């Protein structure tokens, strides 16, 4: 099986880290989550198909925006966003615990 390769623009990576607090090097780990969710970004896929990966990283659900370029995954955005967490939990049927009444 071929090993997945990741790439990104270093300037864009630094901008993302400054703005959202997530390095693209960390974002790669969302793809390792066996329960990750991959979805096509239908609202921004005009010239090339863009995708989201929602995966658990460091006890939070990380949303990674990326494109496939041959056998390479090119990351162009990442952050811990509520909507990504909601999608991840819905697709994995994760339910919040409600405290029991005594």
Predicted regions: what they are:
Residues 1-102:
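Ribonuclease/tRNase effector modules and their secretory precursors
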């Amino acid at each position: 099986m071929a090993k997945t390769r990741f790439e990104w623009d270093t300037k864009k990576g630094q901008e993302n880290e400054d703005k959202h607090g997530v390095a693209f090097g960390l974002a790669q780990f969302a793809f390792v989550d066996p329960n990750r969710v991959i979805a096509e970004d239908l609202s921004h896929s005009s010239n090339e198909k863009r995708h989201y990966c929602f995966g658990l990283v460091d006890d939070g659900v990380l949303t990674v925006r990326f494109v496939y370029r041959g056998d390479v995954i090119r990351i162009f955005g990442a952050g811990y966003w509520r909507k990504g967490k909601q999608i991840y939990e819905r697709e994995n049927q994760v339910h919040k615990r409600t405290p029991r009444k005594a």
